[in-house]
Curated annotation (Swiss-Prot):
Protein name as it appears in the record: Inner membrane-spanning protein YciB
Main subcellular location: membrane
The UniProt record lists the keyword S-adenosyl-L-methionine: no
GO cellular component, one term: plasma membrane
Gene name of the record: yciB
Length: 178
């Protein structure tokens, strides 16, 4: 359920663009829906996840610049900035603070050696770097409509493939241990 909630602003952005072909209207929908998502989270739980704050800040700044300057390039940069912040955050957390973010998220569900946790963190950081670069490539080499479709379907599809590939690697390791 949380996954769908987190995906809602992207789905609404896509729906608004698909219905109108207007990236500025779709950007406004993304801003409002992200702000509403954070507000609802605060109202229901008296807590907002750090990623929701980051998403809200990015959509307010880059979406706001898109609307104020009437320049779609700002909203097209948003996924890249988010991906690169995530990748950098994973690396900084692991290398500078010796706190592996993947282990912090999954450590209670699965037991792995430290070297494998480190590999997972580097794999995710690399994936986020790749996704950020790929977003820019699509945004600035293809039509606006192609980018909007890539933002939802391409990004989600590649994420799913990456997660499944990691699941296969982890399942092989777990089977070896059992």
């Amino acid at each position: 359920m949380k996954f769908l909630s987190d995906l809602l602003p992207v789905l609404l952005f896509f729906a608004a663009y698909s219905l109108t072909g207007n990236i500025y209207l779709a950007t406004g929908v993304a801003i409002v829906s992200t702000a509403a998502q954070v507000g609802i989270s605060w109202f229901k739980h008296r807590k907002v996840e750090p990623m929701q704050w980051v998403s809200l800040a990015l959509i307010l700044v880059l979406g706001g610049l898109t609307l104020v300057l009437h320049d779609k390039r700002f909203i097209m940069w948003k996924p890249t900035v988010l991906y690169w912040l995530l990748g950098a955050g994973f690396l900084i957390s692991d290398l500078a603070f010796r706190k592996n973010p993947i282990k912090a998220m999954m450590g209670k569900q699965i037991e792995l050696p430290e070297r494998l946790w480190a590999k997972l963190t580097f794999a995710w950081s690399g994936f986020f770097a790749f996704m950020g670069a790929l977003n820019l490539f699509v945004a600035f080499n293809f039509s606006e409509a192609v980018w909007v479709n890539f933002k939802l379907f391409g990004g989600m599809g590649l994420m799913l493939v990456f997660v499944l590939a990691q699941g296969m690697v982890l399942s092989r390791y777990i089977q070896e241990k059992n």
